[in-house]
Each structure stands twice: as C-alpha cells, then as structure tokens.
A protein has these predicted regions:
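Ser/Thr-glycine-rich phosphate-binding loops at phosphate-binding pockets of nucleotides
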Residues: 35-39, 106, 130, 237-239
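Conserved loop-to-beta-strand segment in the C-terminal subdomain of adenylate-forming
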Residues: 159-183, 212-226
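Conserved C-terminal "lid"/linker of ANL adenylate-forming enzymes
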Residues: 153-155, 203-251
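Gly/Ser/Thr-rich phosphate-binding loop
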Residues: 1-52, 152
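Adenylate-forming
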Residues: 83, 117-146, 175-196, 215-219, ...
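Alpha-helix-centered segments that form part of catalytic cores
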Residues: 1-13, 196-210
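C-terminal boundary motif of the adenylate-forming
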Residues: 109, 114, 148-173
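Conserved ATP-binding/catalytic segment of the ANL
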Residues: 61-70, 74-130, 147
C-alpha cells in the first residue's frame, strides 16, 4: 500500500476479535467502525490511543451524533444531522425506520461497553425465541464458533425449539493440513466431513464456547456439513452474509 498508510477502517461486517488482536499486535492499525447508508455511513469508530479503542467494539460515537439503546429490545437508535430525512418518495418505508422524535431505527442490536464503546451484538430480525421463551442472538455465538480454525462457516438455529443447535461448515484446508501432519489419508471433502478427528476437534471447541454462554444459549447439537456455502449455491448474499431462511429450508 505504498508504505504511507497510517490506519485502515473496517466496516460492513464484524471483524473477528481474534483477528483484530493479531492486526494490532503486528502494528497494523485496523480500526473497526459502524454506520449505515441512512446515517451517511459513520456512526462510531475506534480511534488512536489505548483510551479510544476497545477490541470487539465499533468504538465511540462520533461528534454530533447521538446514539441510544432501546430499552425494550436493545435496538440501536441514531439521531443527528448526518441521519437521512427519509427514503426518496417512499413515506411508508421512512415511517418504518424513523420515529416521531427523529430517531432512526437501525435494525441492529447492541450495547455500550464501559459507557462509551458501542458494541454490535446482532441484527434485530435474526434474533429468535426458543420454545421456553428465551431470546437468542445467533451472531455472537457464531463469532465464537468461528474462532476455531476448523470451522469456516456456521449458523445457529433453534427458533421454537427446546434448545439451540448449529450447522457447521468445516475449514477443509486447515483440516487437510492437520491430517497431513497426523498421517491421516485425505479423501474427498464429503468423506472427511464425517471423520472422527474432525468431529472431536470441533466438539472440543464447541464445549469451550459453551462455557462462556448462558445455559439457554448453549449448543446441544451440532451438524457438520460436507460442502461450503456460496453465492452461487444461494446460501450467501453478495456481501457474503448468510441467507438464513434459505439455509434453514435447505437443511
């Protein structure tokens, strides 16, 4: 990048905290931020200096912008001169996201860490309720699962069920390296997805992740799949976000 780069801003999708630490330890200032088209992009962003950055957060709110967390559902609400007046010639859509007090409803759920660092926990529409009436935010759990080098993609499910479960797509490249070092003959991805070593490695990580979750959030069952999700396959959007409804129907 020319040797003159001072810092980079990361947005659009969550940056894995583990990866964020690696960047910072390597001297690469990758500062995670948050915003939407409707807010003229930036709402909050991490800054230089230890007092202005928190790993796992999207930083302090920028000057001139107000942010509050809705008491009833934790939705992030934004207000300020950078927030849009409304969608062009679409008052119905505008009314769905702008309230009478001028707060824009982002559709994202979050909280403040230490009173000033905004942290995104999930998308409001992706939160589901179990049969016991407990609400589960899948994104936070999925990010914990993807810290395992043998898990490439995952989706937490459980709406209307007694407990949460997960669909897991292995990182076949990393498992192939493991097999090579362990003297295990590599076959096809389909066959290796059911290999006992892969099941053991993934289950160990799931157990570790469960220890940091509330009892009602803990995964009771995981299904390891034999093919990656893709845009062409219809499971991912062009931004590589999960098409949850499609995946749920497919599996």
């Amino acid at each position: 990048v020319g040797g003159k780069l001072i810092c980079m801003a990361s947005g659009g999708a969550a940056l894995n905290p583990k990866l964020e630490r690696i960047f910072l330890c390597a001297g690469l200032k990758v500062l995670q931020g948050y915003g939407l088209t409707e807010t003229c992009v930036v709402v909050s962003v991490n800054r230089f200096g230890e007092d202005n950055i928190r790993i796992g957060s999207v930083g302090p709110v920028i000057d001139g912008v107000q942010v509050k967390i809705a008491e009833e559902d934790g939705e992030i609400l934004v207000k300020g001169p950078s927030v849009m007046l409304g969608y062009y010639k679409n008052p119905e859509a505008t009314a769905e996201v702008m309230d009478k007090e001028g707060w824009f409803h982002t559709g994202d759920v979050g909280t403040f860490v230490e009173g000033r660092f905004l942290k995104i926990t999930d998308r409001k529409k992706e939160i589901f309720k179990t049969s016991a009436g407990k609400y589960i935010a899948p994104l936070a759990i999925e990010n914990k699962l993807k810290e395992c080098r043998f898990i490439e993609q995952c989706m937490v499910v459980g709406e209307g069920q007694k407990f949460a479960s997960a669909l897991l797509v292995p990182n076949f490249a990393n498992f192939k390296d493991y097999c090579k070092g362990s003297g295990i003959e590599w076959k096809s991805n389909t066959e290796m997805a059911s290999h006992e070593d892969l099941k053991r490695l993934i289950n160990e990580h799931v157990k570790q992740a469960n220890r940091s979750l509330a009892p009602y959030e803990q995964l009771k069952r995981c299904e390891i799949l034999n093919a990656e999700w893709s845009i062409d396959g219809g499971e991912l959007t062009p931004k590589l976000s999960l098409k949850r409804k499609v995946i749920k129907e497919k599996y």
